[in-house]
């Protein structure tokens, strides 16, 4: 009979840790990457510390590159302290483009989209994200840190409301409702492919991000505009590379698309490389051997006391 899997190569995972214990076999096939490409979201203090240790890529969101840049720099610095190449941590910023062949066409499209947007829906969305009931504040109440005293569900998002910028000089429920109804509080760029590409480059330059998590207003319309209008402009600028001709028939993993062909597994400087099956197995066996020796020593000692190693005389 043909075998789908060689049973001799299926290993049992035995783990006992602080938060959970298990003894089982993995239930899915290993991918060419072995460890999935590791995305993380959030730039709070706890999130930044976690990201600097574990994340290969981070979803970030901010209304301004000026506000985002220090957060990116902080995480890169933390990664360096942990022995990682800070540039190996990739940042993908939320970005919603509204595109037209011309700036005028894009503006007309944006005005039409706003006519369908629900500002109340935007407030409900943000209230759910942050745990703050924005409906209890007057529309033009300027939000401050004193208002951020409720259940903090998304701490890094909540922090945005206490940081202003040239793009958003003040945060009020009215401003939040307008921003959240299209773009979800991230940047919205309206214009021709050239204008939107200029804005993308500005974010890369000023915030030090590596890529973008493209938001949409309509589907599939927003994505069709990106493919048909924006991508050709980015390729003309040489900042959105095509797959090399010699590699077009090859399969690329998600990690290779970020780090380059050949980097299927975790980088050598990543924390996860310490956790390989053989290493874990050796550690577990060493711990079990140590426990057996301790038990043997205790059994050999009189009156149930633990045997002590005799000091050697010189």
What is the meaning of each model-derived region?
Residues 37, 47-57, 62-64, 71:
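Long, repeat-rich segments with strong aromatic
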Residues 69-77, 219-239:
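C-terminal helical cap(s) of enzyme catalytic domains, especially alpha/beta-barrels
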Residues 52-61, 179-186, 208-217:
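Glycine- and acidic
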Residues 1-33, 69, 79-202, 234-298, ...:
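An alpha-helical appendage that flanks or caps ligand/catalytic pockets
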Residues 38, 51, 106, 203, ...:
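Conserved, mostly hydrophobic/aromatic
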Residues 44, 64-65, 95-99, 218-220:
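Active-site-proximal loop/turn and secondary-structure-junction residues that shape catalytic pockets
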Residues 40-50, 192-205:
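Short, acidic/polar
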């Amino acid at each position: 009979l043909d075998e789908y899997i060689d049973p001799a190569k299926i290993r049992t995972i035995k783990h006992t840790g602080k938060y959970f214990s298990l003894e089982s076999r993995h239930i899915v096939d290993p991918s060419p990457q072995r460890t999935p490409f590791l995305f993380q979201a959030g730039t709070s203090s706890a999130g930044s510390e976690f990201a600097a240790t574990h994340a290969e890529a981070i979803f970030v969101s901010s209304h301004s590159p000026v506000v985002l840049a220090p957060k990116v720099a902080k995480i890169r610095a933390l990664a360096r302290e942990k022995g990682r190449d800070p540039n190996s941590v990739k940042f993908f910023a939320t970005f919603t483009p509204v595109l037209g062949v011309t700036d005028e066409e894009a503006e007309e499209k944006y005005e039409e989209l706003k006519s369908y947007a629900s500002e109340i829906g935007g407030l409900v969305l943000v209230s759910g994200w942050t745990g703050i009931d924005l409906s209890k504040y007057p529309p033009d109440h300027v939000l401050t840190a004193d208002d951020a005293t409720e259940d903090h569900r998304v701490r890094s998002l909540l922090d945005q409301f206490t940081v202003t910028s040239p793009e958003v000089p003040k945060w009020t429920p009215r401003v939040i409702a307008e921003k959240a109804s299209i773009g979800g509080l991230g940047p919205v760029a309206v214009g021709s492919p050239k204008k939107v590409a200029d804005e993308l480059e500005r974010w890369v330059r000023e915030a030090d991000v590596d890529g973008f998590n493209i938001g949409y207003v309509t589907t599939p319309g927003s994505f069709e505009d990106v493919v048909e209008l924006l991508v050709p402009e980015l390729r003309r600028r040489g900042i959105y590379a095509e797959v090399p001709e010699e590699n077009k028939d090859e399969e690329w993993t998600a990690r290779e698309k970020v780090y380059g062909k050949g980097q299927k597994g975790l980088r050598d400087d990543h924390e996860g490389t310490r956790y390989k099956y053989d290493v874990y197995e050796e550690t577990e066996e060493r711990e079990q051997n140590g426990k057996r020796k301790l038990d043997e020593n205790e059994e050999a000692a009189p009156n149930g006391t633990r045997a002590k190693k005799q000091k050697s005389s010189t």
